[in-house]
Amino acid sequence: NIPPDVSFGNCCSIASGVRIFRANHPSGRFTTHPILYNPAMGYVAKDMLERPPLEIGHDVWIGANAIILPGVSRIGNGAVIGAGSVVTKDVGPYEIVAGNPARAIRMRFDERQIAALESSRWWELDRHELADRIGELDAMLQNPENPE
């Protein structure tokens, strides 16, 4: 179940068991019980929890059983989140993170390759165009200044 305030870019890979949480129980009140924020409990008229949106970029891979906690607002294009990771803060474009809490492991590509990928906007191609350009896009990573 993906919360309604979460948006995904194109060509994302989301493994099984991924959980995305958009709000925390209020820990500064007399109770953390849902009676304070959930209208289904019959004590409040509307949902009282703040749920800011989460934007997940294009070509993001979220590994099996990863958890994305409240407070995360952006996962950048091309990011990779390792299986079982607990993401507590934003993940940059093309950053590989893993662990509990998730920490940067390395970048997928160097700055020139990232710039070439971003300018190509390959994720906007229809499937036929993409199929025709796979070789060109792979070559671009080998020589980002001159993919021809």
What are these language model-derived features?
Residues 26, 93, 101:
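A generic "binding-loop/recognition-motif" signal
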Residues 33-67, 101-148:
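C-terminal segments of enzyme domains that contribute to small-molecule binding surfaces
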Residues 59, 78, 85, 95:
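Catalytic-loop signature of eukaryotic-like protein kinases
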Residues 72, 84, 90-91, 102, ...:
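Short glycine-rich donor-binding/catalytic loop of glycosyltransferases
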Residues 76, 90-98, 107:
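Short conserved catalytic/interaction loops centered on acidic-Pro-aromatic/His motifs
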